[in-house]
Structure formats: C-alpha cells, structure tokens
Amino acid sequence: MLKFICYPKCTTCQRAKKWLDDNKIEYELRDIKLDNPTFAELSSWYKLSGLTIKKFFNTSGLLYKSLDLKNKLPEMSEEEMLKLLATDGMLVKRPILVGDNFVLVGFKESEWSEKLK
C-alpha cells in the first residue's frame, strides 16, 4: 500500500489527499509533524526518488529559514543533510508519496497521474 506522508494543515497536502481520494487510490496516511521520517527512511526515499537531496527540504518553511539553511546546506554532506531532515518533519518537503518502486516529493498532479494511473 502507498504511504502518504503529509502535514494536514498544508494546503498542498490537502489538494494531494483530495486527488488521491477522488481517484480512489488507497494509501496509509502519516502526519509528518507527529511522526517525522527517520534517517533510514529518508536515505531510502532519497535513493529511490532520483532527486537531489535539496528537493527534500521544505525551503519555504519557517524552520528552514530560521536555521539559515540556504547558506548552510552547500557546506553539508548528504549524510549530514539527511540527519538534519530526520530531526524535524517540518524541514521536509511535503507531501511525500511512497510506493514500492517510486517516491514522489511535492504534489504535481501530472506527475502523480503518470505514476498512479
């Protein structure tokens, strides 16, 4: 079953959830703030996604900005970045949809349609 990791108050996550429900796609819901991803999960998702590690950061979030990560990330290793992401779910871009052989980060309807229909 798909894992849908989101923050319920996030409007993009709400749109993604509605899209999943409207398309009758079953998923397991997980609140990223209450149950943030572990280092092992993030490492696995990062490898499976084919994305750059920076795509996993919620660059518009208050925590990202308050920690000045825009300037700090370029000096960090991938392992350091993954460990940092694992400290607080609010640092992680959302929603995340995890399937057996794919990971989608953020909600782009066309991308989700291509993977799921």
What would you call each of these model-derived segments?
Residues 1-23, 27-32:
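Local sequence-structure signature of Cys/Sec-based thiol-disulfide redox active-site neighborhoods
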Residues 34-117:
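Thiol/selenol-based redox catalytic cores and closely related redox-interacting motifs
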